[in-house]
């Protein structure tokens, strides 16, 4: 019975709340933060468990009242109402029972990089950036440009954003991979369609509770920042390169004039990249290999094609095709792709869990 499956979650929630009120925990900030997060993640399922228990009780009481001539009419109404609510509530609960991606509530670093296709790829990085900015705006999320490398022909060779807001990772995690674009460049006189590609990486923003890097494992190099064509060259050593020695991951940052600010930004991205690598290794070790994402989220996996001559956008993971490319891009309507992806993932996970 569903109530039996909900019981451990309710017990765990009550146990965490008890622990949070103990002086021993309140003095340990790191542990308290971790437990508070866990309690918050359990709240939705605990609320639904109460709602479900109330409906089950209502059904049982209404059935008992059916034998009472004075109460039978009212009991029938109550029973009908409760039984109509039950299937929808059960579906909601089944989805909540699925293993939750621990990163779903986190902010993200979104990195878009030009791949094959030269100038056309760089221009599409700019177009995809605008579409993501509109999407973030629709959601009420805050966006900060962390790092950018502009292309001479317009667009970007690479850009990294920090996106903050409610459940950012839970929606944008599906964007990781290769995005292929097919269109006629403005410089193309023969009207030939060119194919180019950009890669998107989605990394959760992490803090010291998620990952702690030993300063001994980090090599920091400082240098003078170089501007395009010798412009805006910083005469002080403000550019920073950080290397995490155990993983070999390197981050370079020169966007800010202050060395300290570049160090802070580089450290943020370094933590996110190391966390992502360790998380991928952990999931691969337990055989999940990024099942939390539809597809691997790997840069090399082609996830989507944007065909401008046909006004078509296709997501290859679920075979979804929409002939509204211009509108989706200009208005940032990514929910039209993300919602079906989430539904697909949930259906697969429910089947796997036997729910």
UniProtKB/Swiss-Prot annotation:
Pfam families attached here? PCRF, RF-1
Please provide, alphabetically and separated by semicolons, the GO molecular function terms listed in this UniProt record: translation release factor activity, codon specific
State where it is primarily located: cytoplasm
**InterPro entries (alphabetical):** PCRF, Pep_chain_release_fac_I, Pep_chain_release_fac_I_sf, Prokaryotic/Mito_RF, RF-1
Q: Which residues cross the membrane?
A: none
Q: What SUPFAM superfamilies does the database record attribute to this sequence?
A: Release factor
Which segments does the entry list as coiled coil? none
Recorded GO CC terms:
cytoplasm
For the keyword ATP-binding, the answer is: no
Q: Record's superkingdom?
A: Bacteria
Q: Show the PANTHER family listed in the entry.
A: LD18447P
- Return the protein name: Peptide chain release factor 1
Source lineage: Bacteria, Pseudomonadati, Campylobacterota, Epsilonproteobacteria, Nautiliales
């Amino acid at each position: 019975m569903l109530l039996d499956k909900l019981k451990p979650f309710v017990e765990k929630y009550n146990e965490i709340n008890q622990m949070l009120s103990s002086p021993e925990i309140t003095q340990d900030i790191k542990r308290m933060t971790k437990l508070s997060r866990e309690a918050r993640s359990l709240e939705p399922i605990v609320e639904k468990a109460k709602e479900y228990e109330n409906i089950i009780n209502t059904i049982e009481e209404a059935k008992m009242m059916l034998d009472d001539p004075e109460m039978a009419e009212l009991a029938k109404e109550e029973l009908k109402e409760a039984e109509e609510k039950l299937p929808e509530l059960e579906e909601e609960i089944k989805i909540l029972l699925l293993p939750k991606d621990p990163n779903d509530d986190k902010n993200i670093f979104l990195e878009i990089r030009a791949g094959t296709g030269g100038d056309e790829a760089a221009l599409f990085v700019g177009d995809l950036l605008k579409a993501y900015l509109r999407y973030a705006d629709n959601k009420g999320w805050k966006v900060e440009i962390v790092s950018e490398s502009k292309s001479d022909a317009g667009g970007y060779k690479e850009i990294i954003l920090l996106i903050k807001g409610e459940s950012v990772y839970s929606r944008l995690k599906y964007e990781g991979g290769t995005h292929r674009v097919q269109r006629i460049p403005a410089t193309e006189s023969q009207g030939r369609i060119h194919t180019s590609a950009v890669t998107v990486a989605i990394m959760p923003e992490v803090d010291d509770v998620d990952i702690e890097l030993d300063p001994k494992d980090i090599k920091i190099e400082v240098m003078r920042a170089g501007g395009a064509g010798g412009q805006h060259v910083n005469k002080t050593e403000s550019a920073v390169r950080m290397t995490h020695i155990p993983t070999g991951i390197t981050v370079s940052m020169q966007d800010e004039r202050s060395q300290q600010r570049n160090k802070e930004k580089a450290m943020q991205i370094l933590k996110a990249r190391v966390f992502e690598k360790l998380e991928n290794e952990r999931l691969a070790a337990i055989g999940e290999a990024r099942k939390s994402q539809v597809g691997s989220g790997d840069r090399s996996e082609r996830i989507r094609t944007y065909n401008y001559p046909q006004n078509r956008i296709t997501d290859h993971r679920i075979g979804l095709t929409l002939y509204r490319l211009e509108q989706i891009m200009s208005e940032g309507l990514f929910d039209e792709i993300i919602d079906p992806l989430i539904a697909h993932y949930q259906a697969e996970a429910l089947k796997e869990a036997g729910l």
